[in-house]
Amino acid sequence: VCGDDGYYDARTGVIQNADIQGLKAGRAGWYSVIEKLYADFPERVRMYESPELLHFCVKTEHFNIIHLDSVIAYTKQRQRDLIVGTEPLLDVFSETDPMKTTIILTHYSYDFLDKSEQKVALNLMTDYNVQLWLAGHEHDELLRKQRDYFYEFQCGNLIHESGETRSCVAVGEFDTEQHNGSVQVFYWDSPNGWTVDAYISRDEERSRYSFALQDAATVTGQVASIV
């Protein structure tokens, strides 16, 4: 699919259905975990198990939550320069409610994507006013603004490990009317238990990372004024 001998081009973003099915064929073990987690939500399980669906959107009262498969091109030999398929990314963006805040949920960070993939993905995120990306993978916290446009919050290791890694979790809040919020990080400090990380921000309250998004109406007005 990708690489020197692959056909994939981020500008068109097409991944052939046969390849999507092949890429998803080896996930039986993962699907069994999903079936247990979402035992009361069979429709969610079907989204994960669909042989042709790479990404999908779950709409709640206030949010569009996009489950973005960032591991489709991952191998032991290819752990960076990943792709998500910009055509299926466009398809799932087109399903969102423009008046709700959209959140991308992935395993890998935006930084792990191929440079061409990053460029096209950023253009699509701008077009659809997507300004929040939540990722895992890193066994530490990483909170930042990407490309002077969207916020990416990366965290997600609850297993105690030795060495430089930390068992930590990010907890946030978001005001759906003001379109702003904040994040705090809690890390496991044995034997004292969960402790707030006191130094995750340069704001006056160093233990809280604050952020603000542009709401859809403001963005629409800016575009209209340019046109």
Where are these regions (language model features)?
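A structural signal for well-ordered alpha-helical scaffolds and beta->alpha junctions
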Residues: 27-34, 82-86, 118, 165
